[in-house]
Regions:
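Basic, low-complexity segments
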Residues: 1-7
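Short, cationic-aromatic polyanion-contact patches
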Residues: 8-22, 38, 71-89
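Short amphipathic alpha-helical interface segments
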Residues: 19-35
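Short acidic, hydrophobic short linear motifs in intrinsically disordered regions
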Residues: 34-45
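Short amphipathic alpha-helical interaction segments
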Residues: 47-62
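A short, conserved structural fragment
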Residues: 61-71
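Short Lys/Arg-enriched alpha/beta "domain-start" segment
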Residues: 84-135
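Charged, low-complexity intrinsically disordered regulatory/assembly segments
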Residues: 120-210
Length: 210
């Protein structure tokens, strides 16, 4: 089993009947700042058995911390009532690509088109929204690498978290699969500017430009 997170737990003021495993999963959801997520994505991310994860999510749903929806789960504001301390060990993100989306592209439509998509070696995990924009998250089929695409204005940043594998080549291949999909969506949603990027930076020892 892939360990979720090494966290400290303090009993919240609200009366929640949660186990240590429940709070570990909540710590992961909070650390990833997930607003929505899928069962399959979380299963791959944590390595938990399907029945174990199902029981945990059922308890969290009973407590009103998450809400089941047709496309997965949505995190409610009740998660803010839990006093989860910052994890002592957190997987750092590695930047892979920086690029720009066309300024006349409707980014909200692009996000809607990307949300929930499975493609190539990537499986959908979830989405987060904060003052740093919208971040869409995928995980490789084997749960080894997490890929995130952050969209803030016209800026697009793609990063990786190496969970159980340090295979940079695999992460780069996954990020190019993501960029290929984004390119196709950009072309299909606007006829005036078929080019996806104005400039592209590659963090692997070389610099490329479009």
């Amino acid at each position: 089993m892939i360990p979720v997170l090494n966290v400290n737990w303090q009993s919240p003021e609200a009366d929640y009947s949660l186990s240590e495993r429940d709070t570990d999963l909540l710590a992961l959801i909070e650390t990833e700042d997930l607003a929505t997520f899928t069962f399959d994505g979380l299963k791959r991310r944590t390595g938990l058995h399907s029945e174990t994860l199902s029981r945990i999510l059922s308890r969290l749903e009973e407590e009103g911390i998450i809400k089941k929806e047709p496309c997965g789960y949505r995190v409610t504001t009740k998660i803010t009532e839990l006093k989860l301390q910052t994890p002592r060990k957190e997987t750092p993100s590695t930047p892979l690509m920086q690029t720009y989306l066309p300024s006349d592209l409707k980014t909200q439509q692009l996000i809607l088109n990307l949300e929930g998509k499975w493609f190539g070696m990537l499986r959908w995990l979830g989405i987060s929204e904060n003052n740093q924009g919208v971040t869409l998250k995928w995980i490789t089929e084997d749960g080894a690498i997490q890929i995130a695409a952050n969209i803030q204005g016209t800026a697009l940043n793609i990063e990786a978290k190496f969970l159980t594998s340090n295979n940079l080549n695999l992460a780069l291949k996954a990020s190019y699969q993501l960029m290929s999909l984004i390119g196709k969506l950009c072309i299909s949603t606007q006829a005036t500017r078929p080019a996806v990027a104005q400039n592209a930076g590659y963090f692997g020892g070389s610099l490329m430009s479009a």
